[in-house]
Amino acid sequence: MTISVAVSGASGYAGGEVLRLLAGHPDVTIGAITAHSNAGSRLGELQPHLHGLASRILEDTTVENLSGHDVVFLALPHGASADIAAQLPEGTVVIDAGADHRLEDPAAWEKFYGSAHAGTWPYGLPELPGQREKLKGANRIAVPGCYPTSALLALTPGFAGSLLQPDDVVIVAASGTSGAGKAAKVNLIGSEVMGSMSPYGVGGGHRHTPEIEQGLGNAAGEAVTVSFTPTLAPMSRGILTTATAKVKPGVTAAELRSAWEEAYDDEPFVHLLPEGQWPSTKSVQGSNHAVMQVAFDAHTGRVIVTCAIDNLTKGTAGGAVQSMNIALGLAETAGLNLQGVAP
């Protein structure tokens, strides 16, 4: 079975990463490649690393150009996907890498994004409890945010196992600059970023906060309160998340580790490292893998989980392709058998 796929937003980092993965997918033929502001340009001018697709000409992002494909990936700015998605045929599998369809609560969407809620689609993080079944046969899929991907992978086993308290969760995550997109910004130029780290969205203002609370709350079966602080790190790609939560009385270090082992032992892309080994962003660069370590701080009664992912791969495009594979009944790992890059 050969699947025809269209990719919108192909001039950006997320769209380019989707194309990189699809170019190596055994079951996919790449059809329309669109980028509204760069229509008419050669893809190779904007994504010079995509050698096999370099001669392709970018088309305008219209419903007409995207229709007629089995799958459409939307790698568009937040708020831009909903209108296009609503006009695509119901039988088309539409995978939205933007935020438009992630949140279940319309009030949370309106508070953090400032527009009308477009509805909720199945959430494309297969490793969450019960999520694979929801993705099978789905024709609309919301790709998680990059920070929520790492945060939810880090803490979901503890909340799903009723081991953690819901009211004191603290998450600090460092991301590479590609997470801020490709548009030129003064704070992202080399002389500002090199040798420096800086927080942003501090004090509960980051848009991924409600998404993290939603996912952890679904796992816990009750509301979870999260303090989330993102940090910009001097690297092009990668996320290193440190997530902590108070454990419930009587929970032991052995119980914690057992919960994470049980959650991820059979997962092809999520790996709990041997005790004493800690995650690094370099070890997952360019891959769809997530690596993590869990520890118990007996002094404070907190679990500490560190998780490393590539924000563009597992955090965006890899998760999108993985979800597509599940939705279409393909091998879940198809097109994703990539190891990290070293040194």
Swiss-Prot record:
E.C. number: 1.2.1.38
Annotated GO biological process: L-arginine biosynthetic process
Domain of life: Bacteria
Active site: C146
Main location: cytoplasm
Keywords noted in UniProt: Amino-acid biosynthesis, Arginine biosynthesis, Cytoplasm, NADP, Oxidoreductase
Localization per Swiss-Prot or TrEMBL: Cytoplasm
Pathway(s) this gene product operates in, as recorded in its UniProt entry: Amino-acid biosynthesis; L-arginine biosynthesis; N(2)-acetyl-L-ornithine from L-glutamate: step 3/4
InterPro entries, per the entry: AGPR_AS, AGPR_type-1, NAD(P)-bd_dom_sf, NAGSA_dehydrogenase, Semialdehyde_DH_NAD-bd
GO cellular component labels: cytoplasm
UniProt-recorded Gene Ontology molecular function terms: N-acetyl-gamma-glutamyl-phosphate reductase activity; NAD binding; NADP+ binding
Pfam families: Semialdhyde_dh, Semialdhyde_dhC_1
SMART domains cross-referenced by the UniProt entry: Semialdhyde_dh
Keyword Cytoplasm among record annotations: yes
Reactions performed catalytically: N-acetyl-L-glutamate 5-semialdehyde + phosphate + NADP(+) = N-acetyl-L-glutamyl 5-phosphate + NADPH + H(+)
NCBIfam families for the chain: argC
Protein purpose: Catalyzes the NADPH-dependent reduction of N-acetyl-5-glutamyl phosphate to yield N-acetyl-L-glutamate 5-semialdehyde.
Family: Belongs to the NAGSA dehydrogenase family. Type 1 subfamily.
The name this protein goes by in its record: N-acetyl-gamma-glutamyl-phosphate reductase
Natural source organism: Arthrobacter sp. (strain FB24)
Lineage, top ranks: Bacteria, Bacillati, Actinomycetota, Actinomycetes, Micrococcales
Gene: argC
